[in-house]
């Protein structure tokens, strides 16, 4: 089986690197080819990496609470760049303050994200979802 490629990074002005490294390690050990663009990454960084590596999925992390602002328009930019249909996952502390999670999840799905994860989601949960949406056993 050919490995599926995932672009992983921390979006916006967020410099939280530890969780990013944990996800990189977990996704790699699960059999994915991980292209980790690191922290302080723009939407364009994710898109360019996905184009260059022919990625199957983009996984966006955000821990500083501004993910909703940073992620707005990503699906449209992916489509415009020729990445129509690429899977988009987002997770972490993606909004400011305590908000009703189903509302947060709905807003991100309306922005075009395929999966939306709250703080504390295990890498195993994300891996299972990646395998499901990418058709990996």
From Swiss-Prot:
B12-binding domain location? 3-137
Q: In which pathway does it act?
A: Amino-acid degradation; L-glutamate degradation via mesaconate pathway; acetate and pyruvate from L-glutamate: step 1/4
Reaction catalyzed: (2S,3S)-3-methyl-L-aspartate = L-glutamate
Q: Which domain of life is it from?
A: Bacteria
EC number(s) on file: 5.4.99.1
Give the top-level enzyme category: isomerase
UniProt record, GO biological process: anaerobic glutamate catabolic process; glutamate catabolic process via L-citramalate
**Entry's Pfam families?**
B12-binding
Q: Name one GO molecular function term.
A: metal ion binding
Describe its function: Catalyzes the carbon skeleton rearrangement of L-glutamate to L-threo-3-methylaspartate ((2S,3S)-3-methylaspartate).
Q: What is this protein called?
A: Glutamate mutase sigma subunit
Q: Which organism is it from?
A: Clostridium tetanomorphum
Record gene name: glmS
């Amino acid at each position: 089986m050919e490995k599926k490629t995932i672009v992983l990074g921390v979006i916006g002005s967020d410099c939280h690197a530890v969780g990013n490294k944990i996800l990189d390690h977990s996704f790699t050990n699960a059999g994915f080819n991980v292209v980790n663009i690191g922290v302080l990454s723009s939407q364009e960084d994710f898109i360019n990496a996905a184009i260059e590596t022919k990625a199957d999925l983009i996984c966006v992390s955000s821990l500083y609470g501004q993910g909703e602002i940073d992620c707005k328009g990503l699906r449209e930019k992916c489509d415009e760049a020729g990445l129509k249909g690429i899977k988009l996952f987002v997770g972490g502390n993606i909004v400011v303050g305590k908000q009703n999670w189903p509302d947060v999840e709905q807003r991100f799905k309306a922005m075009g994200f395929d999966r939306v994860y709250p703080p504390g989601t295990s890498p195993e949960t994300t891996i299972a979802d990646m395998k499901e949406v990418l058709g990996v056993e």
